[in-house]
Amino acid sequence: MTQATNQTPGQDVPGAADVPAAAEGQGQGQGERRGGGGGRGGDRRGRGDRRGRGRDERDSEWQERVIQIRRVSKTVKGGKKMSFRAIVVVGNEKGQVGVGVGKAGDVIGAVKKGVADGKKHLVKVPLTRSNSIPTISTGRDGAASVLMRPAAPGTGVIAGGSIRTVLELAGIKNVLAKRLGSKTPLNNARAAMVALRDLRTHQDTAKERGITLEQIYS
């Protein structure tokens, strides 16, 4: 018995040998599209790496010094809850400095919180060419007060305790500072921050008075 086939005259029917070639071509096209997506993903990863390096470079500019770590307690209904308090000074030695306080159940957590708090309370310090302060300044916090005077190149940082730490991380190389009143490290550090915050350059003074720099120096 002869089977009839519905074949249009002049139309070629693809053979079995031609089918794998077409499937292979489709596979190559899909592979190329997948490869293109992988390339774009690689570019995104590259941009992420660059952003990560930028954050690391910014973080590396900051220096941290712990002034004091104390074990403190809080009386609650169930008794006393013990924790640690860390006083940290953060600065980039380029005219920016901050003092922060952190409390946590462990020392590392308290220091991390202190660093974050210090970066939230940064003060910009106007520095002279000799890395000193432009004018005399005083600061007060609680019972502690600090007096700062400009110094000539080569003098160094004449200060002690937490005040010295604040001045060094601010980038000041030549200054005379005197502590008056309380010896508490936190109050002294905050008094030093107030003195640095209230600093005014000669340009600021001339602008406030409405005169020129020549009139100030004369």
UniProtKB/Swiss-Prot annotation:
- Which residue ranges does the record assign to the S5 DRBM domain? 62-125
For bias type Low complexity, the affected ranges are 11-25
Which GO biological process entries does UniProt record here? translation
The UniProt record lists the keyword Ribosomal protein: yes
Q: Name one GO molecular function term.
A: rRNA binding
Keyword Transport listed: no
Q: List all Polar residues biased stretches.
A: 1-10
Q: Which UniProt keywords apply?
A: Ribonucleoprotein, Ribosomal protein, RNA-binding, rRNA-binding
Q: Where is this region: Disordered?
A: 1-63
A GO CC term attached to the entry: small ribosomal subunit
Compositional bias of kind Basic and acidic residues: 31-63
Taken from the record, one Pfam family name reads: Ribosomal_S5_C
Checking InterPro entries in the record gives: Ribosomal_Su5_D2-typ_SF, Ribosomal_uS5, Ribosomal_uS5_bac-type, Ribosomal_uS5_C, Ribosomal_uS5_N, Ribosomal_uS5_N_CS, Ribsml_uS5_D2-typ_fold_subgr
Self-association and partners: Part of the 30S ribosomal subunit. Contacts proteins S4 and S8.
Protein family membership: Belongs to the universal ribosomal protein uS5 family.
- State the function annotated in the UniProt record: With S4 and S12 plays an important role in translational accuracy.
**HAMAP family in the cross-refs:** Ribosomal_uS5_B
Q: What is known of its domains?
A: The N-terminal domain interacts with the head of the 30S subunit; the C-terminal domain interacts with the body and contacts protein S4. The interaction surface between S4 and S5 is involved in control of translational fidelity.
Q: What is this protein called?
A: Small ribosomal subunit protein uS5
Source species of the chain = Synechococcus sp. (strain RCC307)
Name the encoding gene, please.
rpsE
